[in-house]
């Protein structure tokens, strides 16, 4: 083969390769971020959540069927206030039974839902939910036994925001969709038509394409100043080490059920499955900046990853932030200070140990059994739980809350203590769990792996609180 033919052959191979790449890797312009609709429960206004299929374009101009709420992919953002009584109306318009959970919400199990309250097709449920806890970012989603991974993956997930007087009066960005931006992260695997593909029998699920609010690598125009990002990891098995592509520092201000006592300056944050974090980034100066997963990649890195099925994301861009306009007059660092969690419970009623076997989806050498209660707790009590695992993993608990006493033998500093309901740890962790709400034998709370594939396969336990 002479040089010209060899060159032509090489160019043909590259052209063929590039034609197969996702459009977001090649597009000169990205799509603007879609902000989920906001539903507020004020003056007794009910919150309607219809579980149903929808038609959307995940890639290109190809309409595909997905699941979600109220005719859209994923769910609207529900925003409530401490002291509210929320009239919540679920309606299951899907051809499958679905159990719903609001991860992080603190209330009794008969109101929260969970695996003990499954909605059959065309069935509704209307609990009145008292909002008693402080400000938090929660997560409503499917928790159906043995089907939660698939149903979440199809789109049964949304953000639930709780505000209180303290959070509303704090000097923090609070204009929804403007400088207070919700981001729901998912990793998907799509066929050529843009439909979701799911591998049911795998121990974990890792999609090769990263979506935020149902879009791949979008952008958002924002005014100059401090921007607040509320990040929810709604992926099945993937955790996300997040940073900015220019490696700038930012402020971590909240996790799961509340604010840190004071903001923590970081350059990266790891967000496990089901976990919610809130960060502040300073966009007073400079140009565009992208929130990414892991390290910044070159275009050739992206091409290489596209042709290697190694579980990595082909594009690791979460969102590009494009600041515009004049420098904000109020460009100083936001200052706030919230009440510490943090009188840790002084009386520990009981200590328990749980070992997670990720390979076999077991807790303490047992798989989930709906007839077995794994934890009987006293309402109002605190317990110390020691968690260990064969591999790094995510943990979650329903209807209760905890503070992380230590992780991998490193004690949590007092200024980082915050109420949580999810946790990512490498080997071991000690948590102090507070049980403030009741759960019956017929409608228990659950705990276990936050990897929904693992939970569906048996890494799940039941809690009764009386």
From Swiss-Prot:
This is Cell division protein FtsP. Keywords: Cell cycle, Cell division, Periplasm, Signal. It is found in: Periplasm. Its main location: periplasm. Cell division protein that is required for growth during stress conditions. May be involved in protecting or stabilizing the divisomal assembly under conditions of stress. It comes from the Bacteria. Gene3D superfamilies: Cupredoxins - blue copper proteins. It comes from Actinobacillus succinogenes (strain ATCC 55618 / DSM 22257 / CCUG 43843 / 130Z). GO terms for biological process: FtsZ-dependent cytokinesis. Residues 1-28 form the signal peptide. SUPFAM superfamilies: Cupredoxins (SSF49503). Belongs to the FtsP family. GO terms for molecular function: copper ion binding. The gene is ftsP. PANTHER family: BILIRUBIN OXIDASE, CUPREDOXIN SUPERFAMILY PROTEIN. One of its GO terms (cellular component) is cell division site. Predicted to be exported by the Tat system. The position of the signal peptide cleavage has not been experimentally proven.
């Amino acid at each position: 083969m002479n040089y010209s033919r060899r060159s032509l052959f090489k160019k043909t191979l590259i052209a063929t390769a590039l034609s197969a790449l996702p459009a977001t890797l090649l597009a000169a312009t990205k799509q603007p971020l879609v902000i989920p609709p906001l539903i507020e429960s004020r003056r007794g206004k009910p919150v309607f959540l219809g579980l149903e299929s929808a038609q959307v374009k995940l890639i290109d101009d190809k309409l595909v069927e997905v699941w979600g709420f109220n005719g859209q992919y994923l769910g609207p953002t529900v925003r409530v206030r401490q002291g509210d009584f929320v009239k919540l109306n679920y309606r299951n318009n899907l051809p499958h039974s679905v159990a719903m959970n609001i991860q992080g919400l603190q209330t009794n199990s008969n109101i929260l839902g969970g695996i003990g309250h499954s909605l059959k097709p065309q069935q509704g449920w209307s609990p009145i939910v008292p909002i008693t806890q402080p400000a938090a970012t929660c997560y409503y989603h499917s928790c159906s036994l043995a089907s939660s991974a698939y149903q979440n993956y199809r789109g049964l997930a949304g953000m639930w925001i709780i505000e209180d007087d303290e959070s509303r009066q704090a000097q923090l960005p609070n204009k929804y969709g403007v400088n207070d931006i919700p981001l729901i992260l998912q990793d998907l695997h799509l066929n050529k038509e843009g439909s979701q593909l799911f591998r049911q029998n795998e121990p974990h699920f890792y999609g090769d394409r990263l979506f935020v609010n149902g879009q791949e690598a979008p952008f958002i125009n924002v005014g100059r100043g401090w921007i607040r990002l509320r990040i929810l990891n709604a992926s099945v098995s993937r955790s996300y080490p997040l940073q900015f592509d220019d490696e700038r520092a930012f402020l971590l201000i909240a996790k799961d059920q509340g604010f840190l006592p004071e903001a923590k300056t970081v350059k990266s944050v790891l967000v496990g499955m089901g976990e919610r974090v809130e960060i502040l980034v300073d966009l007073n100066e400079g140009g565009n900046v992208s929130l990414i997963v892991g390290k910044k990649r070159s275009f050739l890195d992206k091409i290489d990853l596209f042709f290697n099925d190694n579980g990595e994301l082909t594009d690791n861009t979460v969102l590009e932030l494009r600041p515009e306009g004049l420098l904000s007059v109020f460009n100083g660092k936001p200052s706030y200070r919230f009440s510490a969690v943090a009188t840790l419970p002084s009386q520990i009623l009981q200590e328990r140990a749980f070992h997670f076997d990720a390979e076999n989806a077991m807790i303490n050498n047992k798989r989930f059994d709906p007839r077995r209660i794994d934890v009987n707790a006293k309402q109002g009590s605190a317990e110390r739980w020691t968690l260990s695992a064969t591999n790094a993993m995510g943990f979650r608990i329903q209807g209760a809350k905890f503070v992380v006493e230590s992780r991998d033998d490193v004690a949590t500093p007092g200024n980082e203590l915050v109420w949580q309901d999810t946790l990512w740890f490498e080997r071991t962790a000690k948590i102090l769990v507070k049980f403030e709400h009741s759960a019956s034998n017929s409608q228990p709370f659950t705990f276990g792996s936050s990897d929904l594939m693992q939970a569906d396969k048996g890494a799940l336990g039941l809690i009764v609180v009386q």
